[in-house]
Amino acid sequence: MRYLLVAFGLLAGAAHAEGGADPDWPCIQRKQPHLSLGQMWTGPEPDDAARALARTPDIAALADRLEQRRLPIATAEAEIAEYAKSADNQHLTALMLAIFDRVEPHRVALMEGIARYGHKQVDLAARIEDHRHRMATLEAATPPDFDAIDAQEQKLDWDMRIFQDRQQALTYVCETPVILEQRVFALGRA
């Protein structure tokens, strides 16, 4: 039964990884390594003045607050609407640029971490397969060394548990870049 679970887990992981065009990308979602402001914002293209405004303390502080995921999107939209009452288009563009400039580097680092996570899963799957081969060799020996078989089985069980826990966490991990994209897009529409 354990071998069946191992085989299923390895096949599911391999099929899961084949979903995207990038072999290093373990997520179902298509890998979009970098976003552009134009994908998220339909307003005017930021010029040098907007870039300078984006670095001002008031806009930077507001962007720092709005980009935080713990702030409900409805609250963030209300704060943008309140800010828009007294701000011109240049300031709104600067605010969007400041938000984007905070989220995008975080998102890129997160995606690089996901790729490393995927590599660790592949390495762990190879280690599990190695445990299986060692167990088969130990079980085929005459006479079988039951202590060695038990030790190998414990290693296999432990690695399988880690592998399965990571596979379950992968769904959430893969959703995080999408959540960040959706937040930036929603704030750009506000």
Across the structure, where does each feature detected by a protein language model lie?
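Hydrophobic h-region of N-terminal signal peptides that target proteins for export
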Residues: 8-17
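N-terminal Sec/ER secretory leader and immediately downstream segment
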Residues: 18-88
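Extended, amphipathic alpha-helical coiled-coil scaffold segments used for oligomerization/tethering
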Residues: 93-104, 122-160, 164
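Sec-dependent signal peptide recognition
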Residues: 1-7
